[in-house]
A protein has these predicted regions:
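Patatin-like phospholipase
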Residues: 10-12, 19-118, 124, 152-161
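Short coil/turn connectors at secondary-structure junctions
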Residues: 8-11, 136-138
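A short, basic/flexible loop-to-alpha-helix module at the beginning of a structural domain
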Residues: 1-7, 33
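Short, charged beta->alpha transition segments
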Residues: 126-132
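Short, flexible segments with low predicted structural confidence
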Residues: 3-4, 91-96, 137-139
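Active-site gating loop/helix substructures
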Residues: 132-161
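Short, conserved beta-strand segments within well-ordered enzyme catalytic domains
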Residues: 14, 76, 141-143
Length: 161
C-alpha cells in the first residue's frame, strides 16, 4: 500500500503523549517536512504538546537537538534513586538489585508525593519560546488536566493573553 499526501493541501496534525513517543513524532515531522507537507494546526497532549509547540515555532533543528540531548535528570529529580536504579527497574532486572533498598527509596518518593519535575519545567521554559508560539501562523491546541479541578482542559495557546 502506498500512502500519498497531497502537498497542495494544508493539514492539521495530532500528537499524543507517551514520553519516548516524542522522539518518534519528531522523526515523522522531519519526514513530513522533507515531503513538502504543510500544516497550519497542531494539537497535542503531554510530550505531544511540547512537540506541537516546537512545530508551531517551525524549529525542527531545535526539536532534533532536544531529543538528542534529553536525559532522565533533565526532566525529573530522582531523589535517592540513581539513573541506573531506574534503568534496572524499567528493564525488569530485579534479581541483581537490593530490593529492600529499592523499596525504601520508592516509599520516600510516595511520601514526598512523587518525583520532583522542576527540572522538566525549567527545560520546557528553555526550549519553548512562548512568544513565538503565540504569534505563529500555526494554531496550537493542547490537552491537559487541571490538577485542582481534576478535569480535562483544552487550550488554544495562540489565544492566551
Amino acid at each position: 500500500m502506498e500512502l500519498k499526501l497531497d502537498t497542495s493541501k494544508t493539514y492539521a496534525i495530532a500528537l499524543e503523549g507517551g514520553g519516548a513517543k516524542g522522539a518518534y513524532e519528531i522523526g515523522v515531522w522531519k519526514a513530513l517536512e522533507q515531503a513538502g507537507v504543510k500544516y497550519n494546526a497542531v494539537s497535542g497532549t503531554s510530550v505531544g504538546a511540547l512537540n506541537g509547540a516546537l512545530m508551531a515555532m517551525h524549529d525542527l533543528t531545535r526539536a532534533i537537538a532536544c531529543w538528542r540531548d534529553i536525559h532522565l535528570n533533565k526532566v525529573m529529580d530522582l531523589g535517592a534513586l540513581s539513573e541506573d536504579d531506574v534503568k534496572q527497574m524499567m528493564s525488569g532486572q530485579f534479581e541483581n538489585m537490593n530490593l529492600t533498598d529499592l523499596f525504601s527509596k520508592a516509599l520516600d518518593i510516595v511520601r514526598n508525593r512523587g518525583l520532583d519535575v522542576a527540572p522538566l519545567r525549567a527545560w520546557v521554559r528553555e526550549v519553548v519560546d512562548v512568544k513565538r508560539v503565540k504569534e505563529s501562523d500555526v494554531q496550537l491546541y493542547i490537552s491537559t488536566v487541571s490538577i485542582t479541578d481534576r478535569k480535562g482542559l483544552e487550550v488554544h495557546v495562540n489565544e492566551l493573553p
